[in-house]
Amino acid sequence: LYSEFEQIAERLEQHYREMQDVEFTIEKGKLWMLQTRDGKRTAQAAVRIAVEMAEEGLITREEAIGRVTPEQVDFFLHPQFDHQAKEAARSAGNLLAAGLNVSPGAAVGVVALDADMAERWATKDGKAVIMVRPETKPDDVHGMLAAEGILTSHGGRTSHAALVARQFGKPAVVGVAALKIDLGARQIKVNDQIIKEGDWISIDGTIGEVYTGKLATIVPEVEDRWLVKLLSWADDYRRLGVWANADRSEDARRGRNYGAEGIGLCRTEHMFFEAERLPLVHRMIMTDLPVERQEALDALLPFQRDDFAGLFRVMDGLPVIIRLIDPPLHEFMPNHVDLISDLADLKIRLKHAGTLGEINELLEQIKEKDRVLKRVENLREDNPMLGTRGVRLGILIPELTTMQVRAIFEAACTVKEEGVDVRPEVMIPLTSHVNELKVQREVLEAEAKKVMTEQDIEIDYKFGTMIELPRAALTADRIAEYADFISFGTNDLTQTTFGISRDDAETGFLIEYMENGILPDNPFATIDREGVGELMDIAVKKGRAVNPKLECGICGEHGGDPQSISICHELGLTYVSCSPFRVPVARLAAAHAALSGRQQETGT
């Protein structure tokens, strides 16, 4: 009977060319087959079954690629909660809250309510930490890196917390409206439940849930040999290049290990937030004297040079796109509201000061705090995301971007002497008018050539720009006269095309828009083909009409979204760039897009 059953099962699998879940019975010594259907499977099983069936000749490699979804590949890249443990937690009433699932994976740790506490507990005490904040800012990055996961009460899919979490592969849940954070009492509250700092919580960034207590996790195997083989097949069929966003050499190494063919975005401003560098940045911002500003920039240069050299060494033989400073300067300074509060506290303490020494010390602190506050107020803008940032900052403070370009080319010359094949590409952000790019490129390319002359070394390089504004997309033919490449920053391009705030929309009207079918998808998660996609199409066609070899890529968060990758393939982009942790997903999605396009062409 067993032999007969084995033969029938084999025949069914061969006929349906799919793993089967069969029901049978044995009555009076006779085998009866009751029904058969395609079997359910885990992500690991789906990959292995597809590869084995292709190797057995039951299906083609193209079919094997098509049978595995990008979401199943994503499972291999992040810890997940044990299913039974999660169900038990639900049954016990331990599901605390839900928010936006902005960075996949499961994380368990104690609550830390600020970045310094998160870093101290994680590095000095060896604790697993979940950093919980109303929202994160650039000066929270050190705590975010130390934490196992990130939880915020505000923010959307393209908020600072979401972007950084995806960049560094940290599970994150944001926009948890029910979460009330009391920094004074060092506790959080959801409805009537209070969680104190130091209590254990578990967050699921894959589906956006928060649990009290510790849930068991499962760590998948990234180097699964079946997955490695399937992705190698995917690489044979995809046309789109897949690059990685990386600000540090370890991120670049991870991206390359996952199959990235270049760095599509290095955010230089992230390098400024290291503890030993931020005071130099503050000095540069605080002074109005050119000599003092240059001294601060000269002190920053070696840090930037070392960072770039590390990236170049890891990416030996592959392109590295380095974006010059993008955010407005006030983002590097203390928060305006915090400064006002601190100043008020100091003045209250001054009223109650008992000794002359204490009075003098407080007066000095008040004077310095007031100086910083005035500078921050001078830098403040009503709409900083459309204010003095990107190329505008480089034009107003040319010595800042000149320092960055010098650091890039000094690093490139150094590593080339070591035998490294270095390929820097300098990206100027937020261009809206061709003359901005023309002016900046002239200044910066002159500095690059000056460094190469000083070092007596020639470097193959490119200068390009980000297309983040509708005007830039519509005038890409003019921009292409001065750009060797363009890269779509689709976060800002979506924001400026729709005229909505990416930081506010996902916790506001956008949810209702999607629930009521006003918008089919979240445009910050998947490219809006009719609007943003149309602008991209215009830019690619206009740009390549002037320069047929124009390299066109995408480095926004959409670069790791399978639906957006399909649109990028359709538009003829050169590459997509995404978080290192999304590279395997993007490789498979790019193959899906290529195979789907081929089927449409042949009508099969």
Model region roles, listed by residue range:
Residues 17-39:
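Conserved metal-phosphate-binding beta-hairpin within the catalytic cores
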Residues 1-7:
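A short, contiguous, amphipathic alpha-helix enriched in charged residues
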Residues 45-53:
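Catalytic, metal-anchored helix/loop core of enzyme active sites in primary metabolism
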Residues 61-108, 433-462:
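Amphipathic alpha-helical
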Residues 15, 32, 80-85, 92-94, ...:
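Acidic, glycine-rich flexible loop/linker segments
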Residues 222-226, 233-604:
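Conserved alpha/beta-domain cores
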Residues 21-25, 61-67, 79-84, 312, ...:
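Short coil/turn segments at secondary-structure boundaries
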